[in-house]
Every structure is written in C-alpha cells, then in structure tokens.
Amino acid sequence: MAFSTEDQIKAMGFCHVGENCLLSNKASYYNCKNIKIGNNVRIDDFCVLSAGIGGIEIGNYIHIAVYSSLIGAGKIVLKDFCNISSKVAIYSSNDDYSGQFMTNPTVPSRYTNVTSSDVIIGKHVIIGSGSVILPGVTLEIGVAVGALSLVNKNCSEFGIYIGTPVKRIKERGKNLLELEENLKGSN
C-alpha cells in the first residue's frame, strides 16, 4: 500500500490533518476543506471520504479499512480508537425511496427529497466488514457491530450488535478502557 506524502496531503486542502497519519494515495477524498483528521490515523486503499456541508471529523487512533466509504451532507464523526473494517458504508444522507420523488445527485434538487442527519461513531467502536450505517445513527462508546449488519437505529454503549436490522445480542467487555489508559501513559 502506498501512502500520500506530507506535501501531497497539504496540497489536498484538508481542514486539519494531525501527526502520524497514513492516507492511501489510492483513496478518494472530496471536499477536503470539510474533513478534519486527528493523530495516528490510517485510511486504506479505495476508501471514499465525501464530506458534505456537515463535514467529516476523524479522531485519534482510527483505522478505516479498504473499500470503506463515508458519504453525505450531514456530519459524520468518528471518535477516538474506532476501527472501520473493510467495505463498511457510513451514510449521512439518504434519497426518498417512496416513488414520490426522483433520486440521485444528477437530478435537480427540486425533484428530489434527500434527507440528511448526523452520524456519530463513539469512542472504541468497531464496525465489522460489509456493514451499513444509515443517517441519524449514534453508536455509543464501546459498541461492536458484527459483519454484514444494517445499523438503522442507535446502539447503546458496550453492546454487541448483529443482523439486518441490528439487534443487541450481548454486553461487550470494557478492558479496552484500561488498555487505553496504559497507552496514554506510555506516550
């Protein structure tokens, strides 16, 4: 995997990029002025980050794996220590599927009914491969989402969720909070 140089990253015009960031030069970044990236972030090949007016905020110690996408007009926030597995799609905007309106971004907005709502991915959240996160969803601290899940509702802290749509199946361990403190103490 080849990563962009510091000069290449600066030329893209991000709102902010922290230290020790590895941004694939095979990923696509749109509206970089609305994208903030913290420290110790890795974004892999073939990811798409398309920031709308709400922007995208990526915290510290975050990995976004291959073929994942963060797209929409609403704000998308990834808090510290998130792991977004491959082929995850996070949407902050949605077309109207009722048939009462036309769809897709090539159609003038007066004929469409796009809705947008913020998506908040809490600290220490892990989202499994192939999952879809819909607009307006908040995943609280420590949530784990199993592979191939559809997240259409908020998920409570330290829950493990799976399915289409997701349902909570059990409690997730909290040892990672102690490990976070150890990591912070070692820096």
Feature roles, as predicted:
Residues V88, D95-D96, T138, S149-L150, ...:
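Flexible glycine-rich beta->alpha loop in the catalytic core of nucleotide-sugar glycosyltransferases
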Residues V119-I120, S129-V143, S149-N152:
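Beta-rich strand-turn-strand
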